[in-house]
């Protein structure tokens, strides 16, 4: 075989191998770790939540901004302090702190009931870890310097609850995940439509979700509401060595 033909064949094989690794295993491993990194991270951070709820046409708009100081740990994230809370332009920090204290007391008395409520919830299953095999990926063109792939459930898993379809972007050189958008294949009860965007960043050896944006429409019967919720993580203060990301 001529050298030029051999070179072309080698390149073709390399491209085929690369295509079969979209997204790269390293990216998916870091995505899985980053999605839950702060839940058990031994440190504190600030969580700011901005929410806008309105009728589908935008009327009866209700806005709120809550800033909380959080900690991670073996039992999961915990609210240590409500720094501030604004609802409809009014400072309701004192009321929010009172509600938090009431919830803590109720949780201490009815932990089993709370767990039952959590078990009834259906989350959004994203690619990563053991869930990766449930998804099929399609490579996307590089955009703004980021490699990407679209994902959707494989046919044999299409009817499983909680699965999503969407797009994942990662840094082409470092393979760090940058952002992901997803929407449920089948919407949860009471939700007509919903999309999620997660943005990840690296600090030292740890990758974590720094920002999320959730948009959707939900409700019951003839009562429908449009919702837009943003969360941002800031002011990370490790209590010890930061958790490493693969």
Regions found by a protein language model. Give the residues of each.
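Short, ordered coil/turn segments that flank beta-strands lining enzyme active or ligand-binding pockets
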Residues: 56, 172-173, 203-204
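Bacterial N-terminal signal peptides
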Residues: 8-16
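Mature extracytoplasmic/lumenal regions of exported proteins
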Residues: 166-168, 178, 182-185, 196-198, ...
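Structured extracytoplasmic
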Residues: 20-164, 176, 185-194, 222-246
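Bacterial N-terminal signal peptides that target proteins for export
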Residues: 1-8
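Extended soluble regions of mature proteins
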Residues: 171-181, 207-213
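Cysteine/selenocysteine-centered motifs that mediate thiol-based redox chemistry or coordinate metal-sulfur cofactors
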Residues: 201, 206-232
């Amino acid at each position: 075989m001529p050298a030029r033909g051999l070179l072309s064949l080698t390149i073709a094989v390399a491209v085929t191998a690369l295509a079969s690794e979209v997204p790269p295993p390293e990216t998916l491993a870091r995505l899985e770790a980053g999605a839950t990194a702060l839940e058990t991270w031994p440190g504190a951070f600030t969580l700011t939540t901005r929410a806008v709820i309105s009728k589908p046409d935008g009327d009866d708009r209700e806005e709120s901004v809550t800033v909380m100081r959080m900690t991670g740990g073996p039992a999961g994230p915990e609210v240590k302090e409500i720094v501030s809370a604004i609802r409809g332009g009014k400072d309701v920090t004192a009321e929010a702190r009172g509600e938090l204290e009431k919830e803590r007391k109720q949780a201490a008395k009815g932990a089993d009931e709370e767990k039952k409520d959590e078990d009834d919830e259906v989350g959004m299953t994203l690619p990563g870890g053991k869930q990766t095999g449930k998804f099929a990926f399609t490579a996307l063109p590089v955009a703004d310097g980021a490699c990407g792939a679209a994902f959707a459930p494989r046919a044999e898993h299409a009817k499983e609850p909680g699965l999503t379809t969407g797009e994942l972007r990662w840094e082409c050189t470092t393979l760090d995940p940058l952002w992901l958008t997803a929407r449920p294949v089948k919407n949860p009860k009471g939700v007509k439509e919903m999309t999620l965007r997660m943005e990840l960043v690296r600090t030292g050896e740890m990758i974590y979700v720094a920002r999320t944006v959730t948009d959707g429409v939900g409700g019951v019967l003839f009562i429908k509401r449009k919702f837009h919720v943003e969360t941002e993580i800031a002011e990370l203060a490790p209590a010890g060595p930061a958790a490493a990301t693969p």
